[in-house]
């Protein structure tokens, strides 16, 4: 899944100030690493015991029955090797300055805790403790934003406007770190002063994709990274699917910006619905493959809400106390030559400098200079292959 990128130099940037019971954390780590014990069985044992450490120190009949069940079906849970692995990981977490959230004792994200397959323990980096995620009646809201890695200018345009509208709301933005919609959502949220949560599908020893490590200082400035995977666990395809349940579970609402019919974004969308969370999607043209998934969920009766801008999402959520910022869209002043070229580009939808040279009867060299000015004015995008696309007007 790509080259690992060490992150150890960043670990001690923030203090570990979230309380976590050490004995409970060790017990949960044993459950997490024991062979044969899946997340559903682990949740069943915890429901019987109340705490993980009760499996090793039962105090009542229910806990004794749970211990007997675990010893019979999951003997590796009580092995010396499992205990040693858990002790090593806990020592590493402490030495690296990570904080932990345990499902059973201490702080844990309230929304995620309601999910039947919530991770037993989460590791994190960054000042997320200031966001109050473990309080059910906290003031801040969470929005998960997902979408394709192959984001188009349409999706980018939407996210720029959407995050700008959220600037005064204090909403927390949750996403992954993939190319495309994920990283665009994270960076635009940061640009507008919004805290972000980046959900990883691997251990804290790396960033995947590696070239997104350059964004780490921004991501840790007013939010942070979380993962259920141990230090050294590499990114594997199945882990991205498992990670998606954290993205869907952390927030009250999941927003799909652009997505084909199949892929991680659609998995996250359906997970959100299975957790009885609100699902929203951005509409697109019927012929666009990157909008096919969004259109599919919007077409299903009572499944997803159509979102054109932040006000739509807030209305669907009933967040009357959160008013998205209303902004006047700044229209740059263009000279006659720029207006001429932009008009021709909009008529075509997308074009090269050669096309626009023919359409406007101007030399290619002059058109290239005009296009550069229009790009600086942020009224068009330059895309691969020497093509230009006009910026989509807001609805």
Predicted regions, residues:
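Short, small/acidic-rich helices and loops at N termini and domain boundaries
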Residues: 2-107, 377-385, 390-394
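Glycine-biased, small-residue-rich flexible motifs in mid-sequence functional cores and linkers
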Residues: 2-24, 103-395
């Amino acid at each position: 899944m790509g080259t690992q990128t060490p992150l150890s130099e960043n670990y001690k940037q923030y203090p570990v100030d979230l309380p976590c019971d050490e004995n409970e954390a060790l017990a949960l780590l044993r459950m997490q690493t024991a062979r044969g014990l899946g997340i559903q069985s682990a949740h069943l044992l915890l429901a019987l015991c109340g705490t993980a450490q009760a499996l090793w120190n039962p105090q009542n009949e229910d806990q004794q029955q749970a211990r007997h069940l675990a010893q019979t079906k999951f003997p590796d849970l009580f092995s010396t090797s499992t205990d040693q692995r858990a002790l090593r990981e806990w020592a590493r977490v402490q030495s690296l300055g990570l904080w932990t959230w345990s499902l059973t004792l201490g702080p844990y994200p309230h929304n995620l805790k309601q999910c039947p397959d919530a991770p037993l323990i989460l590791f994190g980096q960054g000042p997320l403790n200031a966001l109050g995620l473990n309080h059910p009646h906290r003031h801040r809201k969470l929005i998960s934003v997902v979408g394709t890695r192959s984001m188009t200018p349409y999706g980018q345009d939407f996210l720029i406007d959407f995050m700008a509208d959220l600037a005064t709301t204090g909403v927390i933005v949750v996403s992954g770190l993939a190319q495309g919609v994920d990283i665009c959502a994270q960076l635009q949220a940061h640009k507008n002063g919004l805290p972000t949560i980046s959900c990883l599908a691997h251990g804290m020893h790396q960033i995947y994709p590696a070239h997104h490590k350059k964004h780490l200082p921004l991501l840790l400035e007013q939010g942070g990274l979380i993962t259920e995977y141990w230090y050294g666990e590499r990114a594997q395809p199945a882990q991205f699917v498992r990670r998606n349940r954290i993205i869907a579970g952390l927030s009250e609402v999941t927003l799909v910006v652009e997505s084909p019919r199949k892929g991680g974004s659609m998995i996250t969308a359906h997970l959100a619905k299975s957790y009885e969370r609100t699902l929203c999607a951005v509409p697109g043209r019927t012929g666009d493959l990157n909008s096919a998934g969004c259109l599919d969920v919007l077409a299903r009766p009572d499944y997803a809400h159509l979102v054109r801008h932040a006000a739509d999402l807030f209305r669907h959520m009933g967040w009357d106390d959160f008013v998205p910022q209303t902004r006047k869209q700044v229209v740059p002043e263009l000279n006659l030559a720029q207006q001429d070229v932009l008009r021709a580009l909009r008529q075509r939808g997308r074009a090269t400098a050669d096309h626009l040279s023919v359409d406007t009867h101007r030399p290619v060299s002059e058109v290239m200079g005009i296009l550069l000015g229009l790009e600086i004015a942020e009224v068009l995008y330059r895309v691969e292959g020497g093509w230009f696309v006009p910026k989509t007007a807001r609805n």
